[in-house]
Amino acid sequence: MADRISTGELGRRPGQGRVDLLLVGDATRYFLAGSVQKFFSSTAQITLTISNVKKVAALLAANSFDIIFLKVTSTLTAEEQEAVRLIRSGKKKNTHLLFAFVIPEKLRGYISDYGADISFNEPLTLEKVNTVINYWKTYFTNTDMGNTELPPECRLYFQTSCSELGGHFPTDLFLCSELLNNDTGLGLKAPLSSPERNKKASFLHSSKEKLRRERIKFCCEQLRTLLPYVKGRKSDVASVIEATVDYVKQVRESLSPAIMAQITESLQSNKRFSKRQMPIELFLPCTATSQRGDAMLTSAFSPVQEIQLLADQGLNVYSMPAAGGPLEEAVRGQPGSVSEDLYKTRVPSTTLSLNSFHAVRYCSGPVSPHEAAARTNQNISIYLPPTGPSVSSFTPQHCNAMLCPTRPASSSCLCTSGHELPASSRTASSSIFRGFRESDSGHQASQQPTGPSLQPQDSSYF
C-alpha cells in the first residue's frame, strides 16, 4: 500500500496552497521524500504519497496530484514505461500537473526524458527540488502560492545548504521544455510553443543519430583490428562488415557441433546478454566488447586461433579471471560444465579448459619471474605479447617442453610423445601458424621483460 505523509499540522498560514505530491520509483525515493517534505513544511500544506510503479494507475485514478516525481535506477522497464504513459495521459486531464523525471548519473545522455516537464540527474540536492517547486508555482498553478514569499527560516536553510556545497548550484539540471537562463530571479522560462518543441525534438533526434554513427564508427575500427589481414581488402564500413560475416561463418564451420551448442546455450541462458543490459558482445567471448559507460575503445585478442586448434579435443569455453581469482576454484570443481556465475563477471581474459583440467590461459603483457614461480602445477599460463603474431609461440614443440613435465602420466595431455592431433585440427592450426612465424621471430626478442612489471588492466568501452 502506498505511504501517505501529510504536513497539514505544521502551521498552515493564510495565502498558502495545498500541494499533492506523488513519488514513484525504487527504495532511494525516500531520500527525495525527506527533502521535499522538509522544504514544503514551511511554505504549504502538502500530501506526500510514496508508491512503486505497479500502483501508479490506481493512484492516478483515485487522486489528483500536482507534482509527480519518477525516479529510476536503470533503463526503463515495461512497468515504468507504462507508468510514464499513464502520467502523460493524466497531464491532458490535469493542466496543473508537473511531471519531474530523475535520471541516474550513469545513464546521463543515454536515456530519453519521456515527455517530462523537467528532468534532472542524480545526485538529488535541495537546490534541484527548489527549482522544481518554483517552476511549478510559476507555470502550473493559478493560486496565490506563487506570490508568497518564502519565510526567513526557509531562506536561511537554503543559504546554509548552498554554502555547504561551496556556493555552486548543480549544473546537470535541465528542463525538457527549455534550459535554465541566467536571471537572478526564478531562472526559468515559460514552456515552449509547439514549433519550438518540434525544433528541439528535431535537434534531440539529430544528436542521437550522431551518437549512433559514432558508435558504428568505433565498432568498425575494432573489427578492422580483429579481422585477419587480407591484402587488397577494402577498409570501408560495408567491406568490413562483409568480411566480418565471412570470417564468423568460417569460424562457426571450424567448430564442432557440440561446442557451438554449448556456446549457444550459454548465451541464451546468460542474463548479461539481455536487452536491458548496456554491454553488447559477440557470440565469442573477448572478441569485441562495447560498453557505453566510458568514451574508450579496448580490443582484446580473439581466441579463435586457440579454439580452432583445440576444437576437437572436447574443450569448454568460458571466461575466467587471472590466476588466484575467486572463480578459479569453482571452475576446477565442475568438470564439463560452465558455472553461471562465471558469465556474470566481466573478466580480461579467456580460458580454454581441457577435460583434464589443464588450463591454457593467455593475456597481454610480460610476466615477472615472481609471478611465474607462483603458478600451480594444475594451471600453466602462457603470456603472449599484445600483438596477434605471437600466437605462433604456442607450437607443439614448445608444448612438449612445458606441459609434459607437469603431468607426464596424463592420457589426455596433448603434448605426449607420439600424440597427433586430428586432421581437421592440424589443418586449422597449420593455417593459423603459417602467417605468424615470420613476424614472431623478430618480435620475441623485443618482448623480453627487463624487470618485474604489472599486467595491464583492461579498460571498458562505452
From Swiss-Prot:
Keyword Membrane in annotation: no
Keywords: Developmental protein, Differentiation, DNA-binding, Nucleus, Oogenesis, Spermatogenesis, Transcription, Transcription regulation
Role noted for this protein: Probable transcription factor, which may be involved in spermatogenesis and oogenesis.
InterPro entries: bHLH_dom (IPR011598), HLH_DNA-bd_sf (IPR036638), TCFL5/SOLH1/2 (IPR039583)
Organism placement in taxonomy: Eukaryota, Metazoa, Chordata, Craniata, Vertebrata
Residue ranges the record marks as coiled coil: none
Keyword DNA-binding: yes
Record localization: Nucleus
Ranges of Polar residues composition bias in the record: 442-462
Ranges where the bHLH domain occurs: 200-251
UniProt region (Disordered), positions on chain: 422-462
Any one cellular-component term (Gene Ontology): nucleus
Protein name, as recorded: Spermatogenesis- and oogenesis-specific basic helix-loop-helix-containing protein 2
Pfam families: HLH
One GO term of the biological process aspect: spermatogenesis
Family annotation (SUPFAM superfamilies): HLH, helix-loop-helix DNA-binding domain
CDD domains linked to this entry: bHLH_SOHLH1_2 (cd18908)
GO molecular function, one term: DNA-binding transcription activator activity, RNA polymerase II-specific
